[in-house]
């Protein structure tokens, strides 16, 4: 059994790796090769967007944040559970939080990656296991239907969600379907806030389930504040 402190340390080391990405450092050759292959597999995964996703995770995966996040929970399992993960792939690394949640809680992840993002999460898990080899037995990737699992987290379209709800009905499950992000403006937003909203709209080409796709404004609102 890997102790929580070991798991946190492994993810902290992964975060440190992501915080220090340097194209001139041979240590990162594999990372940049993976980015190139991910772009070839999915044209929406531009180098800038993938690097942004890596950077965001680099900021989150630090010892202080991980300790604060896990502090309210007790992870005293008699034995790890196997959690099936059907991951989305609409934006780079969108499914990594599910993998993190399963592993940080001391459970095993049975991972089915989206065909849109089959490379990036596998790369991060490989690096994580280099930092903590004991985690090798805690992650299994598959392209087949799940056959041995205790619970499932599955993400997909509304149609896929209906299938998931039927297929996984006999085990504890968390099913996610389509989501849309909206912004509600009152007219008092600063220039910096509007610039941040613009980023929420266009980052990852607007393909994220939390990408802002609709904006509500007061009657008579000066749209030049947005488009100007």
Predicted regions and their residues:
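Short N-terminal helix-initiation segments at or just after the protein's N-terminus
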Residues: 27-29, 52, 99-100, 152-161
């Amino acid at each position: 059994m890997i102790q929580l402190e070991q798991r946190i340390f492994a993810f902290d080391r992964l975060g440190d790796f992501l915080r220090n990405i340097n194209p001139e450092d041979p240590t990162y050759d594999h990372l940049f090769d993976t980015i190139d292959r991910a772009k070839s597999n999915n044209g929406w995964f531009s180098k800038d967007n993938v690097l942004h996703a890596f950077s965001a995770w680099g900021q989150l995966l630090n010892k202080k944040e991980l300790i604060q996040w896990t502090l309210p929970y007790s992870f005293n399992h008699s034995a790890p559970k196997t959690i099936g993960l059907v991951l989305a792939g609409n934006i780079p690394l969108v499914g990594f939080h599910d993998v993190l949640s399963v592993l940080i809680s001391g459970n095993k992840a049975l991972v089915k990656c989206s065909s849109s993002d089959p490379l990036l999460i596998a790369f991060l898990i490989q690096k994580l296991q280099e930092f903590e080899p004991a985690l090798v037995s805690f992650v299994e990737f598959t392209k087949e239907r799940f056959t041995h699992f205790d619970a499932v987290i599955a993400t997909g379209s509304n149609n896929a969600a209906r299938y998931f709800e039927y297929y996984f009905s006999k085990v504890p499950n968390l099913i996610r379907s389509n989501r849309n992000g909206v912004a509600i403006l009152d007219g008092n937003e600063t220039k910096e806030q509007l610039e941040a909203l613009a980023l929420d709209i266009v980052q990852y080409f607007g393909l994220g389930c939390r990408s802002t796709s609709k904006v509500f404004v007061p009657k008579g609102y000066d749209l030049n504040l947005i488009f100007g």
